[in-house]
């Protein structure tokens, strides 16, 4: 990936989606325990693998899979869990998802901090941070894909007109 702007947005997109996945993983491991740790390691590392695949091969399949992965994380973890279950609850709105435990004032967790209030604050806070991270991931994914699309159009025009030729 030689385009510096695309590289910048690819890096920002990768950082934001990986941080969102890390926050969401800590959120769910805190609640459910270490049983899902392998799944979350895959979820955290997959975007890095896809971006590396793209930088080495330039294939559109890597970008398509990376975009699909981002959409699934943003929609599933960011919007449904982070926004509908935790952010709206923190803002005082009623429970709006079908997620288990979402209607509870205090969700039972496997791990605990120094007090139940601190544990609940950590759990709800990481849910809200998952939503915030997904907002950044959405913006940077859009910028990354848009930059790649503009680069592709520019390259196609150069191929049609050739270097140094005046375009019609």
What label would you give each PLM region?
Residues 44-66:
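Canonical alpha-helical transmembrane segments
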Residues 80-106:
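Juxtamembrane non-transmembrane "cap" segments at the membrane-aqueous interface
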Residues 104-139:
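Hydrophobic alpha-helical transmembrane segments
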Residues 28-38, 88, 117-125:
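Membrane-helix interface and helix-disruption motif detector
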């Amino acid at each position: 990936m030689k385009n510096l702007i695309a590289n910048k947005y690819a890096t920002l997109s990768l950082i934001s989606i990986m941080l969102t996945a890390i926050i969401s993983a800590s959120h769910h491991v805190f609640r459910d325990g270490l049983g899902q740790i392998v799944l979350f390691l895959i979820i955290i590392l997959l975007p890095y693998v896809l971006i590396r695949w793209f930088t080495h091969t330039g294939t559109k399949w890597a970008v398509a899979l990376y975009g699909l992965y981002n959409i699934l994380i943003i929609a599933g973890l960011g919007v449904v869990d982070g926004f509908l279950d935790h952010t709206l609850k923190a803002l005082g709105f009623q429970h709006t998802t079908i997620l288990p435990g979402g209607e509870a004032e205090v969700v039972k967790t496997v791990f605990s901090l120094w007090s139940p209030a601190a544990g609940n604050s950590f759990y709800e806070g990481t849910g809200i941070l998952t939503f915030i991270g997904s907002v950044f991931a959405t913006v940077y994914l859009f910028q990354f894909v848009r930059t790649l699309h503009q680069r592709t159009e520019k390259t196609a025009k150069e191929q049609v007109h050739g270097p140094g030729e005046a375009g019609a």
